[in-house]
């Protein structure tokens, strides 16, 4: 598994945000389509031919410096109070012709739940390309299968991958 932008990429599928466990909320992207997971929102699936758009809202976005400061502050609060939080939620909007726009929750997977502006913008562009078919999910899965399992891409590598996936022609 590897985290690139808003995407948790495994060898078999891609999650928006963290891979959910148990009854936790989430959204899974496969070669076949989009599936909403989790207690109270799960069980919905649309094939790619039904999906008209994908977008996200409520994602924490800060510059790299502000992101580090926020994470440091959160760490101090946890050390002093012992009260850690669950990862923050964000909203995934799945637009379909039949059901209109369906909103689902997903858990942030990055440290502190905060993304940089570049990651966020490129991730939203990639979501649009996944929805319109110009970038197939298989391209992300193929990259993951070729990478060593225990190696996580660096920040620069993650941004380069997002740029590659958002500019590649079909």
Describe each PLM feature range.
Residues 1-26, 37-43, 53-170:
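Eukaryotic intrinsically disordered, low-complexity regulatory linkers and tails enriched in Ser/Thr/Pro
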